[in-house]
Structure formats: structure tokens, C-alpha cells
Amino acid sequence: MEGAAAPVAGDRPDLGLGAPGSPREAVAGATAALEPRKPHGVKRHHHKHNLKHRYELQETLGKGTYGKVKRATERFSGRVVAIKSIRKDKIKDEQDMVHIRREIEIMSSLNHPHIISIYEVFENKDKIVIIMEYASKGELYDYISERRRLSERETRHFFRQIVSAVHYCHKNGVVHRDLKLENILLDDNCNIKIADFGLSNLYQKDKFLQTFCGSPLYASPEIVNGRPYRGPEVDSWALGVLLYTLVYGTMPFDGFDHKNLIRQISSGEYREPTQPSDARGLIRWMLMVNPDRRATIEDIANHWWVNWGYKSSVCDCDALHDSESPLLARIIDWHHRSTGLQADTEAKMKGLAKPTTSEVMLERQRSLKKSKKENDFAQSGQDAVPESPSKLSSKRPKGILKKRSNSEHRSHSTGFIEGVVGPALPSTFKMEQDLCRTGVLLPSSPEAEVPGKLSPKQSATMPKKGILKKTQQRESGYYSSPERSESSELLDSNDVMGSSIPSPSPPDPARVTSHSLSCRRKGILKHSSKYSAGTMDPALVSPEMPTLESLSEPGVPAEGLSRSYSRPSSVISDDSVLSSDSFDLLDLQENRPARQRIRSCVSAENFLQIQDFEGLQNRPRPQYLKRYRNRLADSSFSLLTDMDDVTQVYKQALEICSKLN
């Protein structure tokens, strides 16, 4: 630690950023425009000084590519600090030096209670030494790894503070670009402190950035596909990954290889555990693949879930999103919350009774009746596999909506990735320190079986990678991340274009049967999954009507199959003159007169629509028409025309009936 500079009055507040006009000066000049600056600024020293005279160095907090971070105590004041030492001889890439200096300038310019503060900077020809705020509780990563699952109140506490800090950065024109659990620290009071601005940069709304950096597990679709981006949208995506991890205790995107991870992120495909959480709507909004539809930091800060239980919102700004997504997401979240509370109350009153088959079918039908945009944000049924955004225009029949046997479903998913998480990502990601960790027990291991933690069965169905990584291969949150990579390293075009998505398996016969039965028209009433006695009167059922077994045999056309399930063929025949609307209004009785005229089940206006009365005599008679004449009775006469002409209409109807006879 020898050779650092001593404080000297009048020192210029620069770090040797180069001659006028150089790229370094441009970086310094840009960051100097940040407002507001700290009241007293950051001391920068370039004169020889021995830091050991001022600070008592203690244990090492973390090691990085260019040096290490140590805890230290200032001898004069007793203040505990973190000292980050960077060796210049290990910096081979000029771009890395630019990032280090940019980090110092940006962090020195930001003043927020949830962002790590820089107190002093020392530099000589060999080293750059940064004296910064010390966060005694360590990384949020370790905090979650020890507890596996946080309460919603604690999750909201952490996430509000993270959003507050990110909103402050965006408000001052700074995008972090490397938000992850390892870069979020906790102080003595378990308050958030965001660190590591090594990949941060200034942004402007009318300009695009093209540096593809960050951690792959938190990278947005724009980053992994090498598309230009403005900046804040990549932080919004990372916030979605963070919130998912805080809520569920695992990572949303857990591809076990390069190609799979790229596909998952590009399609926004992630597992959504079935344990209820009111934050799932906000998570989906932040993990929208289209950056124009993705929640902005203002949308997140004003979301009801983030501010639930607090007197004020995270920020006093207005949401800038023009789409209907915020309102829709709020309505859907409220619906889920109210439905869940009502279900819990009913379960307690009924002695925790299980839902009946009819209730499950009703819930599935409700989910299918939702609009396309609402289905994009929420799923009402836990047993329904949602459609991918590319297939929203073509609705799937209910017959192929399969129940998930592993008590999980996927959000924005078109397939399910089977198998255990395999090897870590290849070296192209430069993320050895982010993919595996050995210091924490796997939930599936016997040693991890402790009360209050996930059972082995639950662990087997959740992503095996989770957030467990190797301690020795991961840098400290105080340290700059060397994970910058170009688009050519992150993606081979054939990987995305050539990747295939598993198609859903064909439905089984039982599922097809249930689908067909549920498609009957509204005139047929169902009670407890069985048709009413009046509808299924044995006298009404023709002995010649095909059975389910006969319809499933070869040679029966598909058209006949659909007709037979929905109604008797005599009712829905193309040649029939019976009004389907009038038929639906019938109240079939057990005992009816032996003979009634056809007007009891026919609307007069149906006959008035027929122009060619003579042609009716040559048309084939509807099947089973005589049987229905004998059985149907006492129905009201439907007449939608002007009531003043009722006599004339009635006479015309009688004339038509006589021609039919």
C-alpha cells in the first residue's frame, strides 16, 4: 500500500485522464456533468503516502481480476471502510482502464443512500486505491442463499430500495448494466447498497449503446442478440430477474448451455412456480421481450405491489408507459389476489375441501375466455400451458391444454426443458464466477434437509442451478466485473435461428372427449358434469344415434364427430329449419301432450326468411323431426317482429306449416 498520494490542498480533481481531446477526457467531461454532486466531493490524491499510517488493514473481503478488496479501520476516526486496490500491471486492455476510471467518476458523482459511496481515491504509477463505504452484511446473494426464501414483506423492502437507487441513476442519466445479487450489498441495518459501476455508462434517450456487457443470467434479449439499446431497458430486465429471484429463491433463466440460455432469454421463457405471489404480474411486465412494452423504471416505482403498505411511492414521478399494460397488469394482479383470498376463506369454511371437477372445468373455461392481451400478462389456471407470444393469434383448442404433473407451469413458454441442469456456460460468456458455487448446499442434498426449507420433491422440480455459485470463482460485489464481451462472442446466429422448440404432445383420447363435451352449445345444460334429466330424456335419444365408441372407429368423418358431441344430428342438420335460438330457450318437461303443432318450438320469423315455399317440398325431411314434434310442447311463441302484424305473421306461419306437412 506504499506509494499512494497524501492529501494536498489544491489538488486537481482528476485521475490523470489524459490530454485534452482524448477519450479519457471525454469520459471525465461527460461524467462531470452529473447532478447533483456530493457536497464535499471525493478527495483525489497523487502524492506519495503510506496508507498503513492512516488505515489499519484487516481481512480480505473479495478478490478480483485486477486486485482485491480489504476491510480497514481509519485510525483517526475509527470509521470502518472498504479499500479496493487495483494493480495497473494487470490491466492489459485499455478499455478496462476506461471502465475503471468511469466507475470512479460515476460513483463519485452519485449521492444516494442505497448506492455505495466513495470517500477517497489514491493513484500512482502502479496502483489505483479506492476508499469506499463498507457494507458489513455482505452480498444480497449470500443473504438469500442462507434463507432460500424471503417473506413478501422482506422482498418488498429490498426491492423498493433497489428500485429507488436505479431510478436515481436513470434520472441522472446513468445506466448500471450489471445489476445482480453479487453487486447488491447490505449494511448493518440490512439496507441495500448497490456497488460495482464498472460497466455503467451515461445514456441519452435519442442515442443507442452498443456495448454488450453484463452477466448472462441477467442479460436482456437485446444484449444476448447483439441489438443496439438505449440503456434503461436492460436495467429493467435485470430488475425483473432480481425480483423473480427474491420471490422464488431461484433464477428464472437457467439454461444449462449457451444455446439453451440464449433461446430462453430471447423468447422470455421462464418457469413460474405455483406458489402464489402477487408480484408475478410485475415480474412478467419487467421480463417482456419487446423493450417497448417492458416496464420502465417509472412504471416499476409506481407499481402497486412495490408501494403496498407504504404511505408514499418510491418516486414522485409519473409512469411514462403509453400502453395499457400498467392498468391491465394491476387489474389482473388484483383479480388473482381477491380470488386467492376468497378461495382461502371458502376452503376454511368447507374444511379444506378439494375443488370439484366442475370447478376445475369452470376455471379453465374462464382462462380461455380471456382476451389475447390479458393472457399475455396473467394465467388464471395453474394447469394451463400459456401460449407463446408468436402464437397468440391462433388460439389452441382446450383439448391440448395439458395439466402439468410437476406442479409448475411456464410463463411465455412454448415448451418444457427436461433433464437436470448440466455443465456451466462456455467460456464465451466469461462468467465462471457467476454460474456455479460450492459454498452453499444444494437443496436436493441430504445435508440440506432442514425444517422450513424446500423438500426434495420440490427441489427436483425447480431449476437445479438456482443461484448457487462457487465462492472462489466469483468476484466481490465491490469489484468491477470483467464480463464485457462482443456480440460475436455471445451469439452464433445459427444458435438462435436453428434452435428448435419442443412441440406439445398430441392429446390423449380422454382429454379429447372432455374437450368435445365442453364444446356443446348453450342450450344443453350441465349439472355436476352430467346432462340434466330433461335434456337426456330416453325418449328423445334415438336408438340410431352414434355412440362415442362407434364415432371413434375408423371411417367416421371428423365432421360427424363434432356434430354428434355438440347436439343430435337432427337438430344441427344443415337442412333443418329449426331455429337454434328457439331450441336453446326450451324447457323440456317430463310429461307432455301426445300431439302438438310444430309452432311450439319454431319462431315465426324463421319461416318468414324463407322465400321459396315451393322448394321446401322437395327438400329432404330433417331426421327425427317427427319425434321432436311428439315430445316438444308448451314453449312460448317467439316473435321478434312488430306486434301490430302478429295476425298476419301467424297466418303466414300456418301456411308454411301446411306446406311442410
From Swiss-Prot:
Per the UniProt entry, the disulfide pairs are: none
* Source species taxonomy: Eukaryota, Metazoa, Chordata, Craniata, Vertebrata
In which tissues has expression of this protein been reported? Expressed at high levels in heart and brain, and at lower levels in skeletal muscle, kidney, ovary, placenta, lung and liver. Highly up-regulated in colorectal cancer cell lines.
Function as written in the Swiss-Prot or TrEMBL entry: Serine/threonine-protein kinase involved in various processes such as cell adhesion, regulation of cell ploidy and senescence, cell proliferation and tumor progression. Phosphorylates ATM, CASP6, LATS1, PPP1R12A and p53/TP53. Acts as a regulator of cellular senescence and cellular ploidy by mediating phosphorylation of 'Ser-464' of LATS1, thereby controlling its stability. Controls cell adhesion by regulating activity of the myosin protein phosphatase 1 (PP1) complex.
Q: Which residues form the active site?
A: D178 (proton acceptor)
Task: From the UniProt entry, list the residue stretches annotated as the region Disordered.
Answer: 1-24, 345-421, 442-570
Q: How is its activity regulated?
A: Activated by phosphorylation on Thr-211. Activated by phosphorylation at Ser-600 AKT1 during glucose starvation; the relevance of such activation in normal cells is however unsure.
Q: Where in the cell is it found?
A: Nucleus; Cytoplasm
Factors inducing expression: Transcriptionally regulated by members of the MAF family.
Q: Which GO terms describe its biological process?
A: cell adhesion; DNA damage response; protein phosphorylation; regulation of cell adhesion; regulation of cell population proliferation; regulation of cellular senescence; regulation of signal transduction by p53 class mediator
The name of this protein is NUAK family SNF1-like kinase 1
Biased-composition ranges, Basic residues, are: 393-404, 518-529
Q: Where does ATP bind?
A: L61, G62, K63, G64, T65, Y66, G67, K68, V69, K84
* Enzymatic reactions: L-seryl-[protein] + ATP = O-phospho-L-seryl-[protein] + ADP + H(+); L-threonyl-[protein] + ATP = O-phospho-L-threonyl-[protein] + ADP + H(+)
Instruction: Output the SMART domains linked to this UniProt entry.
Output: S_TKc
Recorded name of the encoding gene: NUAK1
Could you name the Gene Ontology cellular component terms for this entry? cytoplasm; fibrillar center; microtubule cytoskeleton; nucleoplasm; nucleus
Motif GILK motif, residue numbers: 399-402
> Where, per the database record, does this protein carry Phosphoserine?
S22, S455, S600
Subunit arrangement? Interacts (via GILK motif) with PPP1CB; the interaction is direct and bridges NUAK1 and PPP1R12A. Interacts with CDKN1A.
Q: Which cofactor does it need?
A: Mg(2+)
Recorded hits in Gene3D superfamilies, A to Z, give: Transferase(Phosphotransferase) domain 1 (1.10.510.10)
